[in-house]
């Protein structure tokens, strides 16, 4: 009789384990891993862009020597990006995340000014090395957009799981160290249409 009780108890335990595994208890670690993977892609693409900057600046410098203000701003923005000490938990650290985002926005702005200045130099625009770097930069900016989108979606799913039931319960019982992840902000000026006058 006792062996039947133990056997039934084991079956109930197995059934509970399977039931809990199937009802979302593993969603939090799974979604956390998706956020980490998406964040790695964001970092990879930003690093790819930062690696293009020295060659782009050197190419432009050869043609536009007196545009030193723009060249210096790009070089300084890249240096700020390169000097950031990112904590391992950056996606959970609002101050570090904002610092990273701000440095990347500064580099984006400086690169935009550099490309606008390059329009004034027809010889530069015809240079094959510049054209190649410009195409690589454009492709990298597209990759950054895709990586950021994927990260935003992963964070949205993760944060929603932590804030809704039953995910909130699972987090409090099984994952007490789970924290809401930081997400990118979009400046309101990005939504304004540019004014065109003829």
Predicted regions and their residues:
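A helix-centric hydrophobic-segment signal that preferentially recognizes long
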Residues: 2-198
């Amino acid at each position: 009789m006792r062996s039947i009780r133990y056997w039934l108890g084991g079956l109930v335990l197995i059934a509970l384990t399977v039931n809990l595994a199937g009802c979302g208890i593993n969603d939090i670690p799974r979604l956390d891993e998706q956020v980490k993977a998406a964040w790695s892609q964001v970092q990879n693409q930003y690093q790819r862009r930062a690696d293009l900057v020295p060659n782009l600046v050197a190419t432009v410098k050869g043609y536009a020597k007196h545009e030193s203000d723009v060249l210096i701003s790009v070089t300084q923005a890249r240096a700020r990006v390169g000097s950031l000490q990112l904590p391992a938990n950056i996606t959970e650290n609002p101050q570090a995340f904002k610092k990273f985002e701000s440095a990347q926005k500064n580099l984006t702005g400086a690169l935009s000014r550099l490309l606008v200045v390059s329009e004034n130099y027809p010889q530069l625009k015809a240079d094959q090395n510049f054209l190649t770097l410009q195409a690589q930069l454009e492709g990298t900016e597209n990759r950054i957009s895709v990586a950021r989108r994927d990260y935003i979606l992963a964070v949205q799913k993760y944060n929603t799981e932590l804030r809704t039931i039953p995910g909130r319960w699972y987090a409090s019982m099984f994952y007490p160290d789970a924290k809401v992840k930081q997400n990118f902000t979009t400046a309101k000026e990005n939504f304004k249409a540019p004014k065109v006058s003829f």
